[in-house]
Swiss-Prot record:
Its EC number is 3.6.4.13. The modification Phosphoserine is found at residues 85, 566-567. Residues 378-523 form the Helicase C-terminal domain. Residues 153-331 form the Helicase ATP-binding domain. It comes from the Eukaryota. ATP binds at residues 166-173. This is ATP-dependent RNA helicase mak5. It catalyses: ATP + H2O = ADP + phosphate + H(+). ATP-binding RNA helicase involved in the biogenesis of 60S ribosomal subunits and is required for the normal formation of 25S and 5.8S rRNAs. Coiled coil: none annotated. GO terms for cellular component: nucleolus; nucleus. PANTHER family: ATP-DEPENDENT RNA HELICASE DBPA, ATP-DEPENDENT RNA HELICASE RHLE-RELATED. It comes from Schizosaccharomyces pombe (strain 972 / ATCC 24843) (Fission yeast).
Length: 648
């Protein structure tokens, strides 16, 4: 008789995805199963799906010859002395070896190998971390704690609830990750979820998972993510295997646990983390977050510890939090953040920890200002990219600006990639992947890229427009100077944006004078003008031609649906078509003018005939290999060095 089985009980096999594909449009995995019959059984007015496994017959005993051959192969393997791995039982103080086949010298070999690849972690010693955690930090290359980690870990180890203000890229994931993983190490045999981390985006959730996997002190600690991109059924199965840490987005987590009554899995959690809390307060997340907080219940029953992190907090709220929330939060303060803090229900009075109290922007970010007319912003942008090449993120306020700036830079042979809300997931991932892999790439984006995306080694952030809010300026600038690196944030401001800049400075508690006026070489700007004018003409004609093409395609599709013959097919000499062909000829002509200019190196400060004459001794620079990549006659200096010199 075939055996009935639930969908979650079937033995699913993971399908290995091809390596040659660049991305999977946000698709995270695929599983398959064989030998299962699907039948439909009437159940009232509906039909119930039944999964049946075929009857399993016992296999006949192997032939004597085959059995002897297998025994011979097994004995040969035994003679070779293949070492078996020891079984390790984790305890709160360290590792206890329980295997009979354990070789004590193998530990020394592993230790030597570990030390040869790890870094010195003596700077972490005063945190009283377990040897396993110190070993993981050493192997991962974290030689010393960052400021937010130094503030959070001691307080979290005692058991305090934490409200942390930390810049993006400041190391806050490890600040809450280390205490959580230490707790999981002490309770590695627990059969329920120990910690829940809630993040606003799928990308951020997977980054947090990667960090946890990187530093987890024991392979027995299981970390799983619940986000879009994986089948709900698979996530439910994984959740039933009792992972220690769950990292999730609010919407998907709510749908997974609510549909199959898995809310009980989270009622005993010991740690709750709300990362990038300001973004979790958006309408798209807040409803599900409120429901999740209601399910978690009263922390007094489970002694649950709570961590809330954000890069920005309202000034008045900060003052009240610094007073340990004296008198609690009342109805007269009704900001979204405070309403959420009321819903969270802390175990005790939370500690407010600010890693950068002096400034909202990370201390390693140097901020520059370029004042220019709106019509000249493209010219100044091209100048910055040519003069200071490096991985650059350009933030604009509108999607139409992204659609114009990206092809403009591409016409100038600058590798540029768009990122905005109207792009589908596949194209977003393609742009991000190309940008990450190009050390001189430019990501032209709206504020969707300001949070939740960890892109290493971003050298410059350029604000093409003054951002609408101070919070967004902080998040944009936080894309650079991540993980103890230095970075540059340059704000381009037009005359009409001056009042907006003043409001921004007021919110950030700084004067406009604190922005360093970024120097611009006007002689190079004049040389680049011709290129920029030609590129503008090409882009304008291309976009105009594209609009005409889209209109024609729409009219044709409408005519086909109505069963009417298209008038375009009858008359090939329509004005639109002749205009389109004229535009194409103009574009080809303009590109032929631009090509030799782009091929030619920019020269400044010296004579082409006499290398030692003029303001720059070019012969000496060539001999000393002090030549700029794009501009002959200029020193190869970074934008960071320029701002550092002007700051002194």
């Amino acid at each position: 008789m075939p055996k009935k089985a639930a969908l979650d009980e079937l033995k699913w096999k993971e399908v290995k995805l091809p390596d040659h594909l660049d991305d999977f449009d946000g698709f995270m995995g695929l599983e398959e199963i064989e030998g299962v019959d699907i039948k439909y059984q009437p159940k009232g007015a509906m039909k119930e799906v039944i999964y049946e496994l075929p009857e399993v017959h016992e296999k006949k005993d192997k032939k004597p010859e085959k059995r002897k051959k297998d025994q011979k192969e097994a004995s040969e393997k035994k003679k070779k002395g293949k070492r078996t791995s020891p079984t390790i039982e984790m305890t709160s103080l360290g590792s206890k070896v329980t295997s009979k086949n354990y070789n004590e010298f193998s530990t020394l070999e592993e230790e030597d190998e570990h030390n040869s690849h790890g870094v010195d972690v003596s700077a972490w010693a005063h945190f009283s971390l377990s040897p396993e955690m110190l070993g993981s930090l050493s192997k991962a290359g974290f030689s010393k704690p960052m400021p937010i980690q130094s503030l959070v870990i001691p307080e979290a180890s005692i058991g305090f609830d934490i409200i942390g203000k930390a810049d993006t890229g400041s190391g806050k994931t490890l600040a809450f990750g280390i205490p959580i993983l230490e707790h999981c190490l002490r309770n590695v045999d627990a059969k329920y979820v120990q910690a829940l981390v809630v993040a606003p985006t799928r990308e951020l959730a997977h980054q947090i998972c990667q960090h946890f996997e990187l530093i987890k002190p024991s392979p027995n600690i299981r970390v799983m993510s619940i986000t879009g991109g994986l089948a709900v059924q698979k996530q439910q199965r994984l959740l039933n295997k009792h992972p220690h840490v769950v990292v999730a987005t609010p919407g998907r987590l709510w749908s997974v646990i609510n549909e199959n009554n898995l809310t009980g899995n989270f009622k005993k959690i010991k740690c709750l983390v709300l990362d990038e809390a300001d973004r979790l307060l958006q309408k798209s997340h807040f409803e599900e977050l409120s429901k999740l907080l209601e399910i978690l219940g009263n922390p007094m029953h489970t002694q649950r510890q709570t961590f809330i992190f954000s890069a920005t907090f309202d000034e008045g709220l900060q003052q009240r939090l610094k007073k340990n929330m004296k008198g609690n939060i009342t109805e007269k303060y009704n900001s979204p953040m405070e309403n959420m803090l009321k819903e969270v229900r802390f175990f005790g009075k939370p500690k407010f920890l600010d890693a950068n109290p002096q400034s909202a922007v990370a201390s390693r970010v140097l901020e520059g200002l370029i004042e220019c007319a709106p019509a000249e912003k493209d010219l100044y942008l091209y100048y910055l990219i040519m003069r200071y090449p490096g991985k650059t993120m350009v933030f604009a306020n509108g999607i139409e600006d992204i659609k114009r700036i990206t092809p403009f830079l591409n016409e100038l042979k600058v590798p540029s990639y768009p990122l905005h809300a109207q792009l589908d997931q596949k194209k977003r991932l393609q742009s991000l992947e190309k940008f990450k892999n190009n050390p001189k790439g430019v990501l032209v984006c709206t504020d969707v890229a300001a949070r939740g995306i960890d892109i290493p080694s971003v050298t410059h952030v350029i604000h093409y427009h003054v951002p609408h809010t101070a919070d967004m300026y902080v998040h944009r600038s936080g894309r650079t100077a991540r993980a103890n690196e230095d970075g540059v944030s340059i704000l381009m401001c037009g005359p009409k944006e001056l009042s907006q800049l003043k409001r921004l400075c007021y919110r950030l508690k700084k004067k406009i004078e604190t922005f360093i006026n970024f120097p611009v070489d006007m002689s190079i700007l004049d040389i680049l003008k011709t290129r920029v004018v030609l590129a503008h003409k090409i882009v304008n004609l291309t976009r105009k031609d594209g609009r005409v093409g889209r209109e024609e395609a729409w009219l044709k599709s409408m005519a086909q649906e109505l069963g009417v013959e298209s008038s375009d097919d009858e008359d090939p000499d329509l004005p639109k078509k002749s205009e389109s062909s004229k535009n194409k000829k103009q574009i080809a002509h303009l590109r032929s003018e631009l090509a030799p200019l782009l091929h030619e190196k920019i020269r400044t400060g010296f004579s082409g005939r006499y290398l030692t004459s003029g303001l720059v001794n070019m012969a000496e620079k060539l001999a000393n290999e002090e030549v700029h990549d794009n501009i002959i006659g200029m020193d190869s200096i970074s934008a960071l060095e320029v701002l550092q010199k002007r700051k002194k």
